[in-house]
UniProtKB/Swiss-Prot annotation:
Organism: Saccharopolyspora erythraea (strain ATCC 11635 / DSM 40517 / JCM 4748 / NBRC 13426 / NCIMB 8594 / NRRL 2338)
Domain of life, source organism: Bacteria
BP-aspect Gene Ontology terms: translation
UniProt xrefs under Gene3D superfamilies: 1.10.287.3980
Biased composition (Basic residues): 1-29
A single cellular component GO annotation: ribonucleoprotein complex
One MF annotation (Gene Ontology) recorded for this entry: structural constituent of ribosome
Record gene name: rpmH
Renumbered residue ranges of the record's region Disordered: 1-30
Assigned keywords, A-Z: Ribonucleoprotein, Ribosomal protein
Protein name: Large ribosomal subunit protein bL34
Protein family per UniProt: Belongs to the bacterial ribosomal protein bL34 family.
Length: 47
C-alpha cells in the first residue's frame, strides 16, 4: 500500500500570504508576535 504524496509542497507566495509580515501587521495579536520576536532579537521576524 502506498502512503500518498508528501503534504509539504513548498510555495513562497502562499508562505508569505499566510505567515508574512503584512498579515502579522493586520491584527493586534500579530503585531504582538512581531514585537516579541524583535524583543528577543530574532534574525527573521516573519516568513
Amino acid at each position: 500500500m502506498s502512503k500518498g504524496k508528501r503534504t509539504f509542497q513548498p510555495n513562497n507566495r502562499r508562505r508569505a500570504r499566510k505567515h508574512g509580515f503584512r498579515l502579522r501587521m493586520r491584527t493586534r495579536a500579530g503585531r504582538a508576535i512581531v514585537a516579541g520576536r524583535r524583543r528577543r532579537g530574532r534574525a527573521s521576524l516573519t516568513a
